[in-house]
Amino acid sequence: MDVQERLDAILDITDSKICPHCLGRRFSDVMEGPGNRLRGERLVEKFSLHLEGPCLVCGDVFERLDEAALRVREKVDDLNLEYSSVLVGTRLPDDVLRIDEEIDRRLGIQVEGIKREVNRELGKRVTSILRCPADFESPDLVITVDLRGQIRVHVQINPIFIEGRYRKLVRGIPQTKWPCRSCRGRGCSRCDYTGKMYPTSVEELISEPVLEATGGSDSKFHGSGREDVDVRMLGTGRPFVLEIKEPAIRTPDLRALEDEINRRARGMVEVADLRFSSRNRKVELKESSRKKYKVYRAIVELEGAVSDEDLVKLEKLDLIRQRTPLRVSHRRADRIRERRVLEISWKRLDDHLELIIKAEGGLYIKELISGDSGRTEPSVSSILGVPARCASLDVLEVGEPA
């Protein structure tokens, strides 16, 4: 149908109770123009139309957008947030969405839906009144305005991400907060009512000063792999990303934070190279952990004498078939993994042996040494022909993909 026929059909369906926005939107596919409202006003002028209200399609929702934008500013101001970008969305009455779709169906046309226009028009007002741009990919704030009855505003504060590297300089600290096995975090006599298996963790030592500086509600720690509780993380440290949820401050002074974390950690943990990051980096860090090589220093106890000729045989360690270790089988899938030892060197230390092992990520080093009752093959123990045990272990380097 031509413009006149479409116009007549619209006026008949709505009994002329339609606003310029909802009228102009139905001609966006056949008429150029700077916007639906102006397009509708041109149609009114050109065809001498007399439109009545309230609009049968939208219920005059467009007349409420200025008020809605003011309500958004009030809400955001009350929250006292730091932000530099927003994304605005709305909730409309179901009958408005249904009528809008039904009219287009009866006309046999495919044009922009009412919700998209309302979002755009309100978004323009909000970004203007807040003096910040819209960001459709990674906004600081996601603002949802409920226009179903009384105007209600909900503000979602998106997280910030800070990455860096940490060194764990003492043993006996887990990477992340470890809930008590008995009470599962509720607090009991076993955990001295702390809800934790250990007094602190790398995660807590790093996150607590950051939460204070940002006013965040919670945090989540993402490491590039993890070391055991009794293992130190030395060298240049392990990469991590700290996710801070609902921060009031999005750009804290990272140099000052670095100093504060290190001061409060009292030599247990150190951080370096703090910088702002992104959600994608969190995913990359997790996915790359398996591909990174690790360098370890292991002090090994041997239950028997071995010659230097025996020790040279350790250089043959290459492809390792490792079944899920017994010590983690209660929380890891029972399967066989293949990992490679990339380099190994040895040095005698009195009645112990020092091994420097470079290996692919995901290889369990303690079990590489002991053999784990035959679940890891080959192993240091099987090659030397004597029982071997890892007395202490340090991670010296978390490198780039091997």
Swiss-Prot record:
Signal peptide: none annotated. Keywords: Isomerase, RNA-binding, tRNA processing. Pfam families: Pus10_C, Pus10_THUMP_arc. Its EC number is 5.4.99.25. Residues 37-159 form the THUMP domain. Responsible for synthesis of pseudouridine from uracil-54 and uracil-55 in the psi GC loop of transfer RNAs. This is tRNA pseudouridine synthase Pus10.
